[in-house]
Amino acid sequence: MAAKASIRAPGQRITSALTIAETSRAVLRAHLSGRVTAQQHRAALLTLQRFARRCHIVSVTETILTRAGRPFPVEPIRTLVAIHLATAEALGEPPALVIIITRDIRVRENSTALGFSVE
């Protein structure tokens, strides 16, 4: 998978604090619904912690929330998607230097429209 290779590749990793919260909630829901065992739940949380330690985590600021409230190239999108996209824009890096790793089609379409590379 290209995404896993990119996550493990050398270079700086940046993610939104929202990513960590969303992933923690998804892992918890999977455990509480019985889709994963307690052991799998613990392993997933450890993996998330390792990932978070390797990343610069960007806080969800008022500036990001304000940008998230404005239109994006491909609408409609959900609020959390808008926050992720606004976070990428807030980095202030030329889009050609940023790779967005996502499975979400709405993030993918908007990232491409904004000039970011997507995996």
Whereabouts are the PLM-identified features?
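Metal-dependent nucleic-acid phosphoesterase active-site entry motif
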Residues: 1, 52-55
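Short, well-structured N-terminal submotif of metal-dependent ribonuclease cores
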Residues: 1-20, 30-44, 116
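Glycine/charged-rich beta-loop-alpha catalytic/anionic-binding loops adjacent to active sites
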Residues: 2-9, 49, 66-72
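Acidic, PIN/NYN-like endoribonuclease modules and their adjacent C-terminal/linker elements
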Residues: 7, 16, 20-22, 85-86, ...
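Amphipathic alpha-helical interaction segments
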Residues: 18, 22-25, 43, 63, ...
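Hydrophobic core segments within long, regular secondary-structure runs in both alpha-
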Residues: 42-49, 65, 108
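Active-site neighborhoods of divalent-metal-dependent phosphate/nucleic-acid chemistry enzymes
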Residues: 54-106
